[in-house]
A protein has these predicted regions:
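N-terminal secretory signal peptides and thylakoid transit peptides that target proteins
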Residues: 1-18
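Metal-dependent enolase-superfamily TIM-barrel catalytic cores that perform enediolate-based chemistry
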Residues: 168-285
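C-terminal segment of N-terminal export signals and the immediately downstream linker at the start
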Residues: 23-67, 82
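Glycine-rich, aromatic-flanked loop segments that form ligand/cofactor-binding clefts
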Residues: 143-179
Length: 415
């Protein structure tokens, strides 16, 4: 017998006077979240504070560079201000950056990034036809560089530009990312990650990834979940990510196992665009269900939040188009008392996660860290740090890189 009530049972118990109940057996109150008009109003709240920039910051150049395996977007204003971002490594998107994005931004005032430019970029030369990873990743690269430039110009960190920092250190989990391991090999690897990073939480992969209910190997997921709890102990929090592996019928037994071990959440149990299937799983579990890594539509995020299709929203800071778009999702989620725990991509992506987490009110219990801090730590002053399961938020202006010239010196220009 299940020891935990489902989410619907919890919601039903909180209803003092029962409203109309339809043939589904669930109340209208149980099915609905905030009004969509209220969610739209929350999303539209301005985030970017450019009040300290009292003169135009006209974008003069945007370049794509490569050095030591990293790709950079470097921006410069007509008065010599500069900023830099690191991409998530998708060089094949270069033509979109070169032909459709850079020409739009050059000559524009960077201060209008939120109020005007991002919306107009979407319309420019029918860019909306490319929405999804192809457009939003490229938009994010430029946005991150412009935020860095604006932060440097006024002496504010990205978190302070985006409404103000409210925390200076972030709890993280470390993710395995493997499916080629046996359960025994996987828990051994997870323990090594904990030993290496000091993480207080881990995430492992379940199912076969977009696999129509097949496991990576027969019985792997069912064995891995209890073994992870036994091997890692109660002091380590667990997360499970199915990467769209299951339909609801097959997701629920996996979710029950995660409930039994007290997991933090069950990520993307069903195909990412099967919103109703994901909601069916979420409605049947007490365990929080998360999703949104592959989402690119604000209106579908709004549906998830309004209909409680997930319990935790997870926009990817690259795939979803940057921090400003992701902050709109966080604003809607906050109205619904729902955490926003961003997904990250790219080796440097954890730095953008730190800035976003530093300013988001309900960021959830843990953020993802994909390791590799030592590659970038000394770019910052003080250096990036990791200890006791926490990452420090960079404190310098913009993204916090101390010396752009030193970081990109000798880079090869791709665009």
């Amino acid at each position: 017998m299940r020891s935990q009530p489902t989410r619907r049972e919890i919601l039903a118990a909180s209803v003092v006077s029962a409203p109309f109940v339809g043939c589904s057996g669930t109340s209208q109150r149980e099915e609905s979240g905030p009004d969509t008009g209220d969610l739209d109003a929350a999303a539209a709240k301005p985030v970017l504070d450019v009040s300290a920039l009292d003169t135009p910051l006209i974008i003069d150049s945007i370049r794509l560079l490569e050095k030591d395996g990293d790709q950079f977007v470097h921006v410069r204003s007509k008065d010599g201000a500069e900023g830099v971002s690191l991409t998530n490594g998708r060089r094949y998107l270069g033509p979109i950056l070169q032909d459709l994005v850079i020409p739009f931004f050059v000559g524009k005032d960077a201060r209008k990034l939120e109020s005007e430019l991002l919306f107009e970029l979407y319309r420019h030369r029918s860019n909306y036809k490319l929405q999804g990873l192809a457009l939003w990743s490229v938009q994010a690269w430029v946005e991150f560089a412009l935020l860095d430039m604006m932060g440097r110009a006024c002496g504010k960190s990205i978190g302070d530009l985006l409404g103000g920092t409210i925390r200076d250190e972030i709890d993280f989990y470390v993710a395995s990312g493997r499916r080629d391991s046996t359960p025994e090999e996987e828990v051994e690897y997870l323990q090594a990650l904990v030993d290496e990073t000091g993480a207080k939480a881990v995430k492992f992969r379940l199912g076969g990834r977009m696999s129509r209910n097949l496991d990576a190997s027969p019985g792997r997921s069912e064995s891995l979940i209890p073994l992870a709890r036994k091997a890692l102990g109660d002091a380590i929090d667990l997360h499970g990510d199915a990467n769209s592996s299951y339909d609801p019928e097959h997701a629920l037994p996996i979710g029950r196992l995660l409930e039994e071990v007290g997991a933090v959440y069950f990520e993307e149990p069903c195909p990412f665009d099967h919103l109703e299937d994901t909601k069916a799983v979420a409605d049947s579990l007490a365990l929080p269900v998360s999703g949104g890594e592959q989402e690119y539509s604000e209106r579908r995020f709004r549906w998830m939040i309004a209909n409680r299709g997930v319990d935790i929203v997870q926009p990817d800071l690259h795939y979803y188009g940057g921090m400003l778009r992701s902050a709109r999702v966080a604003n809607m989620a906050e109205l619904a008392q729902m955490p926003t725990t961003v997904h990250i991509s790219g080796g440097f992506g954890f730095v953008y996660m730190l800035h976003f987490a530093s300013r988001t009110k309900d960021i959830g219990r843990y953020q993802e860290y994909k390791r590799n801090i030592e590659r970038y730590a000394d770019w910052f002053d003080p250096p990036l740090w990791i200890r006791d399961g926490k990452l420090g938020v960079p404190t310098g202006p913009g993204v916090g890189i101390r010396d752009i010239a030193a970081v990109i010196g000798g880079a090869r220009e791709l665009i």
